[in-house]
């Protein structure tokens, strides 16, 4: 590290001189980062030797011991600088914290300085600071900062590359081959460090020739390389982290025995690449399973090519893939269960089992309810009010006489419907509510009967109520009638009186309809009897006794007997 600092100082020496900066000081950040300490300096008085070539001047003590030179004002300035500067406050601490160059123009200096205006520049570098000072006003020049940062980054780049190259050689070659290679690389390092320095180049030539040629792209590139190498310093072998060398992207690659400096290495640890790729694909590794899925690995062609190399990595990949598959299925199961108590695996499985049991119980209850409803419907659909005659249920016409009877066959269906209506007959419901002094709300629910709505309208009119709104709805054999009525001015009608009247009318309507049906059935039977008797007399009068006529007579008598039975049943 000391040699690197000295080399950096020699690279920065062209900046100082009689027509340039008075001195350049290199400050190094201490390990505890509480202060910066003196590492070295370049004095502008050394330029007098190169210009005069004689030793006429008296030599005095100067902190720049690289070259003996006459004592000048620059030496006086350097002698007043401390060996270390605390970083509690001040421009040094601010420069390191902000990592920004400080270009300061000062007007007050110590009494030993005659000039009243001076310029001080603090440039942050990895691990320290570079300070430039001049006893005159110097305009801010970015080229000076780029010049310092460029040499610092190149020096750090060379140092990191050499150290990593030596570490690779130590790890990859036998012990007997190390001595010659280390000597060869040491000589190359010495050649790089002993490059001819531009001591005889003046600062003006540097400003005019070299500095303007540095483009912004090169400056940014150097800064990026410096930051990257500065981060990689923690993984160098000198810090004891040899295992991390495989992850360092700036390992050197040798081609035909010639090391290539500063190029990223492609020879990284294959196992590390496999592990990193698997971690990126799976996201996380869940523990809790003890078997592996070998069938998936055998089907994967990617693993067949590596069958001779990474058996351990192959088993690890298979185990992780199997766990990922289980986790995906577990997540899918968790999304289907509505109630999850906890997010661990055992709780998810337990909640899923309980949910399945609840669904099974619910399905069983619905099945039982469906069976009960079907049994109830079967019982209600059986014929009611029938009569047994010689073991045969008689509910209408005899089946054997339907082809010979003059009565339509639809009569049997009407009788069945009438019998069902009788079995489901209900008590009428009447609700009457008085909205205000004259308006009433009337609701009548009863069985549907032909002419029932007309009779309700007539009843309301007879009570002195005028219907302003009416609504009727029928469902199966029931009908709901809703009326909004208004009484006349000269009528004194109460809600209870209206309800009782309508309830009596609906009951009488139901009974009257049944009586009408019975009377109609009786009249039809008498008419059929007269027709059959007239047909029989006509046959005897003509003297025809055809076998078919005899069968017709028997059927007519049988049907006449059946009609009497049916009439008896209706009564």
Curated annotation (Swiss-Prot):
Residues 381-390 have a biased composition (Polar residues). InterPro entries: bHLH-TF_ACT-like_plant (IPR054502), bHLH_dom (IPR011598), HLH_DNA-bd_sf (IPR036638), MYC/MYB_N (IPR025610), TF_AMS/ICE1/BHLH6-like (IPR051358). GO terms for molecular function: chromatin binding; DNA-binding transcription factor activity; protein dimerization activity; RNA polymerase II cis-regulatory region sequence-specific DNA binding. GO terms for biological process: anther wall tapetum development; pollen development; regulation of DNA-templated transcription. Mostly expressed in closed, post-meiotic buds, and, to a lower extent, in pre-meiotic buds. Detected in leaves, stems, and flowers. Residues 275-284 have a biased composition (Basic and acidic residues). Residues 556-571 have a biased composition (Basic residues). This is Transcription factor ABORTED MICROSPORES. It comes from Arabidopsis thaliana. The lineage of its organism: Eukaryota, Viridiplantae, Streptophyta, Embryophyta, Tracheophyta. The gene is AMS.
């Amino acid at each position: 590290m000391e040699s690197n600092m000295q080399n950096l100082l020699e690279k920065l020496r062209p900046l100082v001189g009689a027509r340039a900066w008075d001195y350049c000081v290199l400050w190094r950040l201490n390990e505890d980062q509480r202060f910066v300490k003196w590492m070295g300096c370049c004095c502008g008085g050394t330029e007098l030797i190169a210009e005069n070539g004689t030793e006429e001047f008296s030599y005095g003590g100067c902190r720049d011991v690289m070259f003996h030179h006459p004592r000048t004002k620059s030496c006086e300035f350097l002698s007043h600088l401390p060996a270390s500067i605390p970083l509690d406050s001040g421009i040094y601490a601010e420069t390191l914290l902000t990592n920004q160059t400080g270009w300061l123009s000062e007007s007050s200096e110590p009494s030993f300085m005659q000039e009243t205006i001076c310029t001080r520049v603090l440039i942050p570098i990895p691990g320290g600071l570079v300070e430039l000072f001049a006893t005159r006003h110097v305009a801010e020049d970015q080229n000076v900062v780029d010049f310092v940062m460029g040499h610092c980054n190149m020096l750090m780049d060379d140092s990191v590359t050499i150290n990593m190259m030596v570490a690779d050689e130590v790890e990859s070659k036998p012990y007997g081959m190390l001595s010659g290679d280390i000597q060869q690389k040491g000589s190359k390092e010495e050649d790089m460090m002993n490059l001819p320095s531009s001591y005889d180049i003046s600062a003006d030539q540097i400003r005019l020739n070299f500095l303007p040629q540095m483009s912004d792209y090169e400056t940014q590139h150097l800064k990026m390389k410096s930051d990257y190498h500065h981060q990689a310093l923690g993984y160098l072998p000198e810090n004891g982290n040899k295992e991390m060398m495989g992850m360092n992207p700036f390992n050197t690659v040798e081609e035909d025995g010639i090391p290539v400096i500063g190029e990223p290495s492609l020879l990284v640890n294959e196992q590390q690449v496999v592990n990193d790729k698997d971690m990126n694909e799976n996201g996380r590794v869940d523990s809790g399973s003890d078997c592996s899925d070998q069938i998936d690995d055998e089907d994967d062609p990617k693993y067949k090519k590596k069958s001779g190399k990474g058996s351990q990595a192959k088993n690890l990949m298979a185990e992780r893939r199997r766990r990922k598959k289980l986790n995906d299925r577990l997540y899918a199961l968790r999304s289907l269960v509505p109630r999850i108590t906890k997010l661990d695996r055992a709780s998810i499985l337990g909640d899923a089992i309980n949910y399945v049991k609840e669904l099974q119980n619910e399905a069983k209850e619905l099945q039982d309810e469906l069976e009960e409803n079907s049994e109830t419907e079967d019982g209600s659909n059986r014929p009611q009010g029938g009569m047994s005659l010689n073991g045969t249920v008689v509910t209408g016409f005899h089946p054997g006489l339907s082809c010979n009877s003059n009565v339509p066959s639809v009569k049997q269906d009407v009788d069945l419907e009438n019998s069902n209506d009788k079995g489901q007959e209900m008590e009428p419901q009447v609700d009457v509510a008085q909205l205000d002094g004259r308006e009433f709300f009337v609701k009548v629910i009863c069985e549907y009967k032909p002419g029932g709505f007309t009779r309700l309208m007539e009843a309301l009119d007879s009570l002195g109520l005028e219907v302003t709104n009416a609504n009727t709805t029928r469902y199966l054999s029931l009908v709901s009638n809703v009326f909004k009525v208004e009484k006349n001015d000269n009528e004194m009608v109460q809600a209870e009186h209206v309800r009782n009247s309508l309830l009596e009318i609906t009951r009488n309507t139901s009974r009257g309809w049944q009586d009408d049906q019975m009377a109609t059935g009786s009249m039809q039977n008498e008419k059929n009897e007269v027709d059959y008797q007239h047909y029989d007399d006509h046959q005897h009068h003509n003297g025809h006794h055809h076998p078919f006529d005899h069968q017709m007579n028997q059927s007519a008598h049988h049907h006449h007997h059946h009609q009497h039975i049916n009439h008896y049943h209706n009564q």
